[in-house]
Each structure stands twice: as structure tokens, then as C-alpha cells.
């Protein structure tokens, strides 16, 4: 376990999946969902080179079939620590003989964590090390405890978006695939989304044209989590039915669109990266 620590926060990160496992304040309050039990086992996985699920678990490149599990290679792990200090850690996932069987590109996917006061900055660095154009999507999947404070309950919490927005909601199947149906998604005063009373909420809300800053909060406590995600086109909000956590997931792409071409380059929200080039993305988590 890699530990980042200052007088405000202690952040514990597992090497294998470069995954935040714990974020604690100075008084010992845990903000991250701890996984396990009857609910989701993860805490904050990183998603690459796809987000979500593929139809029938495969895609094609020039007609050749490749099988790849939900959320891609990084969800399965095998990262290595390449830098670790008291306030910064960098993890890297690279291609291997095994990965080339399901994703035929030579690549580097780095996840860099930087701790500054009560702010965690997460950078994704994608490098195409191949001699051809590489296609990918990526995203974050952090899960936070709800309630954040003792004595509270899930129904007291809501999302407050910094900017007014009129997002588009995607209809998803029970397996998390996109049906192709989209419609306006209502927010209270264009900024507020309660965690309860939304039939569409369970299990996932998937939004486009969303504000790029959101706070998970309650009027019953001063504790909150704020995320920014400039450069991520989509936002997924996921919650296991009756579970005591919520995931805030900025993504650059989408799950598979039913009936779409199976070619990876035609996948909804896919990014094309030329040979030898690098892309970078950043999101932040602020703990209060």
C-alpha cells in the first residue's frame, strides 16, 4: 500500500489497480466506500481502455474479434509504482504479451496522485507506443460513503452542481448498455440532484453536457466531497440498490451502444490517439 499523508488527509492507494482504498481526515473519518459485504467490492478503480460493458464482451478491429471485460484492462490491475513520495505517487500500466491478446496496442497508462492540503489531484496520462493509431476511452470510478457523518442517512444527501446545466440522460439496459434513447434530465433549479426520489437513479444515471464540478453534501453536516472533471464529456452516477455509498464517475466515453458497429474505432465516445502521441486528463477530489 502506498500512503500519501499531510496534516489534513491520509490517502491509501493499492498498487495492483492503482486504486484509492482509503481517504481519512485527521479525526479518523473515512470518506471512501470500503468495499465488500453484499455490495460492490471496489473502492475507486481506474478504467482503461474502455468504460462500461461491451455487447457480448467483445469488439473488433478490421473484423478481427477481441474479448475484453467490463471497464477494460486497468480494472483487472497489474500496475507498477514508478514514483512515491509523501505527497505524490505515480502508477503505470503497460502492454504485455497477455494484454495484446485483448487489446492489440502498445501503450502506457499512468495514474498520478498528488495530495495538497485537502485536495487530491488525479492525472491520467495515456501514451501510444505503437506504430499505428490507438483507440481508447477512460474514466474514474470513486465510491464515497453515504452518510459521510455518523447519525446521518442516505436520504439526507444530494448533489449540488456548481453551474446550471440541462444535461442529457442516456437510457441504459439492466446490463448497463446504451439503448440509443436520450432525453433531457431534470435537475432542481438546474443544479440540484437528490440521492432519493429519482426512479432513474438505480442503478445508474448517465449524463452528457453536465456541469464539470459537483459536491456531494447534506444540510445536516459540514462534511462534503467536491469533484471537478474538466475534459471528461460524460458523468455516470452509480449506486447499488440500498447500498451506503455513491460513485461519481467522470468518463471520456460511454458503454456500448446496442446495434452500433462492433469496430472499436466506431464505438461511441472513443478517442483516437496517433502513434507516439500522449493525452492527459485531470480530475480532483476535495474533502471537507
Predicted regions mapped to residue ranges:
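Beta-strand-rich interaction surfaces with strong enrichment in secreted/lumenal proteins
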Residues: 110-112, 203, 268-273
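Beta-strand-rich N-terminal accessory domains
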Residues: 1-61, 65-68, 210-231, 277-287
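Active-site pocket scaffolds in enzymes
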Residues: 223-288
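Acidic, contiguous internal or C-terminal segments within carbohydrate-active enzymes
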Residues: 4, 95-148
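Active-site/ligand-binding surface loops and adjacent short beta/alpha elements
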Residues: 146-229
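Hydrophobic residues positioned within well-ordered beta-strands of beta-sheet architectures
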Residues: 89-91, 109-111, 122, 138-140, ...
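Extended, loop-rich substrate-binding clefts of extracytoplasmic carbohydrate-active enzymes
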Residues: 64, 69-117
Amino acid at each position: 500500500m502506498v500512503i500519501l499523508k499531510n496534516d489534513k488527509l491520509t490517502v491509501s492507494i493499492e498498487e495492483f489497480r492503482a486504486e484509492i482504498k482509503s481517504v481519512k481526515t485527521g479525526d479518523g473519518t473515512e470518506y471512501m466506500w470500503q468495499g465488500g459485504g453484499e455490495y460492490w467490492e471496489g473502492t475507486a478503480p481506474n478504467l482503461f481502455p474502455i468504460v462500461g460493458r461491451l455487447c457480448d464482451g467483445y469488439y473488433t478491429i478490421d473484423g478481427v474479434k477481441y474479448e475484453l471485460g467490463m471497464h477494460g484492462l486497468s480494472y483487472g490491475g497489474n500496475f507498477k509504482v514508478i514514483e512515491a513520495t509523501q505527497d505524490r505517487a505515480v502508477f503505470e500500466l503497460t502492454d504485455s504479451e497477455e494484454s495484446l491478446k485483448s487489446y492489440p496496442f502498445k501503450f502506457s497508462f499512468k495514474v498520478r496522485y498528488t495530495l495538497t492540503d485537502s485536495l487530491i489531484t488525479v492525472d491520467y496520462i495515456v501514451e501510444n507506443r505503437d506504430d499505428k493509431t490507438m483507440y481508447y476511452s477512460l474514466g474514474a470510478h470513486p465510491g464515497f460513503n453515504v452518510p459521510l457523518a455518523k447519525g446521518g442517512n442516505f436520504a439526507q444527501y444530494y448533489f449540488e452542481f456548481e453551474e446550471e446545466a440541462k444535461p442529457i440522460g442516456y437510457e441504459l439496459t439492466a446490463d448497463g448498455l446504451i439503448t440509443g434513447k436520450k432525453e433531457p434530465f431534470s435537475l432542481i433549479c438546474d443544479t440540484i440532484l437528490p440521492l432519493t426520489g429519482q426512479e432513474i437513479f438505480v442503478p445508474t444515471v448517465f449524463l452528457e453536457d453536465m456541469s464539470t464540478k459537483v459536491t456531494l453534501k447534506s444540510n445536516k453536516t459540514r462534511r462534503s466531497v467536491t469533484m471537478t472533471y474538466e475534459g471528461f464529456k460524460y458523468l455516470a452516477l452509480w449506486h447499488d440498490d440500498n447500498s451506503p455509498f455513491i460513485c461519481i464517475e467522470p468518463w471520456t466515453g460511454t458503454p456500448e451502444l446496442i446495434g452500433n458497429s462492433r469496430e472499436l474505432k466506431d464505438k461511441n465516445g472513443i478517442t483516437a490517439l496517433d502513434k507516439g502521441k500522449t493525452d492527459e486528463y485531470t480530475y480532483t477530489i476535495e474533502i471537507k
